[in-house]
Design a protein with these regions (language model features):
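Structural alpha/beta surface segment adjacent to cysteine/selenocysteine redox centers
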Residues: 1-75, 80, 139-140, 144-149
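C-terminal cap of thioredoxin/glutaredoxin-like
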Residues: 1-10, 71-150
Length: 150
């Protein structure tokens, strides 16, 4: 929910933030969900699928192969399911995810979400887990960056 609010309010063209998202699956079960999000990206539906995967986690998390559940979600958000199914088996998705995760490891990422502002990881305090807390950090960093640029 916090990520959705941040994307809606800050990740806008010409806005104060450049929103960059990297794949960083933490558990075996999250790897196929990450692939599903990348396949949705091919149809311009990355964030819709991402948000749906989290909203419907109970429908897929305990399945050995959750691809059927992801196809159902793809259908629910208006995707071409034939194209989506074909994408789920592409090897380049695995390579892309592993490279993205390694990039995160190289930056010191140990969990999700991890948020960087002006190249620095935002500490995971109680403030980090609320929209208002993150908004306050963003505004403080934006003000500091503006002052430094004067």
């Amino acid at each position: 929910m916090v990520g959705k609010l941040l994307r809606r309010n800050y990740a806008v063209p010409g806005g104060p933030l450049r929103w960059v998202s990297f794949e960083f699956p933490l558990q075996d079960a999250s790897f196929p969900a990450t692939v599903a999000s990348l396949c949705a990206e091919e149809q311009g539906k990355y964030w819709e699928m991402h948000d749906m995967i989290f909203a419907k986690i109970e429908s897929w998390a305990n399945q050995g192969n959750p691809n059927g559940a992801f196809v159902d979600l793809a259908k629910d958000i208006g995707m071409d399911t034939r194209e989506f199914k074909s994408c789920l088996d592409k090897r380049e998705n695995t390579r892309r995810i592993l490279a993205s995760k390694q990039f995160g490891v190289d930056l010191g990422v140990t969990g999700t979400p991890t948020i960087f502002i002006n190249g620095q990881a935002v500490p995971r305090t109680n403030q980090f887990y609320s929209y208002q807390g993150l908004e306050q950090v963003i505004q403080q960093e934006a003000a500091a960056a503006a002052t430094a640029g004067e």
